[in-house]
């Protein structure tokens, strides 16, 4: 491992500022925790893994420029990072041209493959499908969609609309607000939600707008019965910004919640409490960044090399005992087998798991299986919730 190209170095592409800074900060520290653990084990080939960080500020162009700087000027071949889909898409051609590797620890809309990206967050069959079944069964068939105005919410809503129609559900409204919404943007959206009289609200709003939206909906409904807000992305980081009565009763689907009472989860939470700063929250996407970085290091240790081609050869053979449970990457599509859990938030802001898949779900990023009943058969033999 004497060459510059083989220096154990990871570039972290997580924003410290911007609309998704809270969640990306949690991801950054999840990745750093894994690096600390790997270095306690001796690093790679006896050399410690080093990290470089930049703050792209949530701007896709800056993600691209940061990735180019890491690769061209700093000798980085492995990146961990990106949250919003348009930031991943900005980085994709950079890593493909350089034959570098990006580990992407975030849920996304599916319908994508790159040999230079390892997808560590859920695809639609691992989150949207079980959530749609759960909402229809437990809350009703009438739904309003609201999302931030970029790729991921629009594509996720396309999939969710299809799933609702399969079950005889009705999408009453599909509303989008800017990534940096004004008070008026939020109020207009909430009034449309209120007038629709939906059974449930499906939100793909991300970042700072999440708490603003949830708070505005609670105000508009007052003491009346308000529909639950269900989300693929709302995490402990966003809930920490809400009052307890605003968060209570909301529904989230994710592979992991910090409230899971297993030995692996308890150990992870304890490690995070000893490592994370006060402004970083333990989230599902911190867990994804943690296990993806751990997998990267384990593959390099197995290869005895920090070369991309050597690491990739071992990447698919390793199963990580992650805090969520066992995870592994599928060779044919670079997506990950993940657990799926649906939780409702209680009065203390704790995510109480109401359903979980009996075993990790194989990814179906291209939605090859179109029917919810067929998806149920692919979920480790477990029925949809």
Swiss-Prot record:
Entry keyword annotation includes Membrane: no
One of the GO biological process terms: regulation of amide catabolic process
Domain remarks: Consists of two beta-alpha-beta domains with a central cleft in which the amide binds.
Recorded superkingdom: Bacteria
Self-association state and partner proteins as the record states: Homodimer. Forms a complex with AmiR.
Function: Negatively regulates the expression of the aliphatic amidase operon. AmiC functions by inhibiting the action of AmiR at the protein level. It exhibits protein kinase activity.
Protein's name according to its UniProt entry: Aliphatic amidase expression-regulating protein
GO molecular function, a single term: amide binding
Keywords: Kinase, Repressor, Transferase
């Amino acid at each position: 491992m004497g060459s510059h190209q083989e220096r154990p170095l990871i570039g972290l592409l997580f924003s410290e500022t911007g609309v998704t800074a809270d969640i990306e900060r949690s991801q950054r520290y999840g990745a750093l925790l894994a690096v600390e653990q790997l270095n306690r084990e001796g690093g790679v080939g006896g050399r410690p893994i080093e990290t470089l960080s930049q703050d792209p500020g949530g701007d896709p162009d800056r993600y691209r420029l940061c990735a180019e700087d890491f690769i061209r000027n700093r000798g980085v071949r492995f990146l961990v990072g990106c949250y919003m889909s348009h930031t991943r898409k900005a980085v994709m051609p950079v890593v493909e041209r350089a034959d570098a590797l990006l580990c992407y620890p975030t849920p996304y809309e599916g319908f994508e493959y790159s040999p230079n990206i390892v997808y560590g967050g859920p695809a639609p069959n691992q989150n949207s499908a079980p959530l749609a079944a759960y909402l229809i069964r437990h809350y009703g068939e009438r739904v309003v969609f609201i999302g931030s105005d970029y790729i991921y919410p629009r594509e996720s809503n396309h999939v969710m609309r299809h799933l609702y129609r399969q079950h005889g559900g009705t999408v009453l409204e599909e509303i989008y607000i800017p990534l940096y919404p004004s008070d008026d943007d939020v109020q207009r959206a909430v009034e449309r939600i209120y007038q629709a009289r939906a059974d449930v609200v499906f939100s793909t709003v991300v970042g700072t707008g999440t708490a603003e939206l949830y708070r505005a909906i609670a105000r508009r409904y007052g003491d009346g019965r308000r529909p639950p807000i269900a989300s693929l992305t709302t995490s402990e980081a966003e809930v920490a910004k809400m009052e307890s009565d605003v968060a209570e009763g909301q529904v989230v689907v994710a592979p992991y919640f910090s409230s899971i009472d297993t030995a692996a989860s308890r150990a992870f939470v304890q490690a995070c409490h000893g490592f994370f700063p006060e402004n970083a929250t333990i989230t599902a996407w911190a867990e994804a960044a943690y296990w993806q970085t751990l997998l990267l290091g384990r593959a390099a240790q197995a290869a005895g090399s920090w070369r991309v081609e050597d690491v990739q050869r071992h990447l698919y053979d390793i199963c990580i005992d992650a805090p969520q449970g066992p995870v592994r990457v599928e060779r044919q599509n670079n997506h990950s087998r993940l657990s799926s859990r649906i939780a409702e938030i209680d009065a203390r802001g704790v995510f109480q798991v109401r359903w979980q898949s009996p075993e990790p779900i194989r990814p179906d990023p291209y939605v090859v299986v179109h029917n919810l009943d067929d998806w149920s058969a692919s979920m480790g033999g477990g029925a949809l919730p």
